[in-house]
Amino acid sequence: MSEINSQKYKKLFQTVCEAPIDAPKEAFNLHDWVFTLSDKDYQTTARGHIGAGSSIHTDGTQTSVNVESVGGNLLVQHYVAEVKEPDYVKMVSMSDLWLMKLVHVVVKVTWEMRLISVSDSECKFQNTVLVEHPNFIMKIMSALALGGYFVRKHNEEETPLFAENLYKRTFKENT
């Protein structure tokens, strides 16, 4: 186990955003959607999305690799799903982060997506991003660099576009 994995993490920031979907949550499968999201679709869901792909390790573990720029910082995320349900996916990544594209650090990013029933014919897509690091200095650096602000703005941009993509892909494939 690497040194960073054995340390206690401190929350740098967390953001939760929601977007309405005009269909019941039972119509969707978040796990299938996120692991079949094409590179092109990923790029259309936020200005900072550079590329994405998924693969399967030799041990059978499914992974999703996302490359994005948030607030001038470059992230390469190596997500592994911890929970894979049709209406809830939780993925964790030990992400490579280049602060201002210069200083390399590794942060733990937890990405959770949920579908929450609103009525028999509607649900909402909830997108949660949690960024953690074991060193308190990173919390100070993140605050000084307005990291929480930029991650929140990024989440506000991508959440409705993820919901729209989920809806379009689900109903296009089912027709």
Regions flagged by a language model, labelled:
Residues 14-16, 74-78, 106-112:
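Short, surface-exposed coil-to-beta transition loops
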Residues 22-29, 33, 150-158, 162:
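Short amphipathic alpha-helical segments
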Residues 23-28, 82-88, 114-124:
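A short, structured loop/turn motif at beta-sheet edges
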Residues 11-15, 28, 61, 89, ...:
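Residues at beta-strand starts and edge strands
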Residues 98-157:
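Beta-strand/loop substructures that line and gate deep hydrophobic ligand-binding cavities in soluble
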Residues 160-175:
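Short, highly charged C-terminal tails/helix-capping segments
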